[in-house]
Amino acid sequence: MAGTLYIVATPIGNLEDITRRALRILAEVDLIAAEDTRHSKKLLHHFNIATPLISYYREKEQQRAEELIAKLHAGTNIALISDAGTPAISDPGAIVVNMARQASIPIVPVPGPSALTAAVSCAGLIPGEFLFVGFAPPKSTQRCTLLRSLRDLLYPLVFYEAPHRIERFLKDCLEILGDREILWARELSKKYEEITHATLGGLLASLNTEKLRGESVFIIYPPTVLP
């Protein structure tokens, strides 16, 4: 009988956000596949969980996914976790999930923290529709091509971005999309959490690149439609 693949959400900053169910699953499974075992060891140690860990990172995702599928076929129950938040959303995980689905291996989500839903919940989106893009391409040429393809959509656009690319990302957004409203959520659930509502131009003008830390979520509102 095949094992079960659990997709387990872990805190994005505040350890109090982990669910009791997540803790139970992490303690009960036979193996935990973690994006970075060094990072996850600290989390598991904090909660006195001694389940064995195996690394599952993007550079070796295909190879590791095949190994995990073999273990699942052999009856091993495995929990997949990322460094923070929900796995397989702009993090490694999609390959093993797809392989498990194609092999009819049970897949069980264990929902919890997510930077995406945390940011969207503070954006006041009515009726709640949005397009999640994830990380834009790191190179400006490719990023601008993507932004042009999204320019005419009447949906809020949700991006993740790394601190060292924020200024260039915002400049490209302003150039391609125009001076739209934007919500910037950074350090979510952490000590220095900050949620800023501004325009792209205003945010760029006030940006202090020396203080940028941690990954950010940006929600770019659709263009104002005049009657």
List the predicted regions and their residue ranges.
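Class I SAM-dependent methyltransferase SAM-binding "motif I" and its flanking Rossmann-like core
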Residues: I95-L153
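Conserved helicase motor
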Residues: S55-Q62, A136-S140
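Short active-site oxyanion
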Residues: L26-I32, I105-V108, Y155-L157
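Glycine/small-residue-rich loop that forms an oxyanion/phosphate-binding "nest" at active or ligand-binding sites
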Residues: Y57, A65-S114
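Glycine-rich, flexible N-terminal cofactor/catalytic loop recognition
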Residues: M1-R58
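A contiguous loop/helix-start segment that scaffolds small-molecule binding in enzyme catalytic cores
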Residues: A2, T76, Y155-P227
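Alpha-helix capping/helix-boundary segments
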Residues: R38-S40, G85-T86, A115, R165, ...
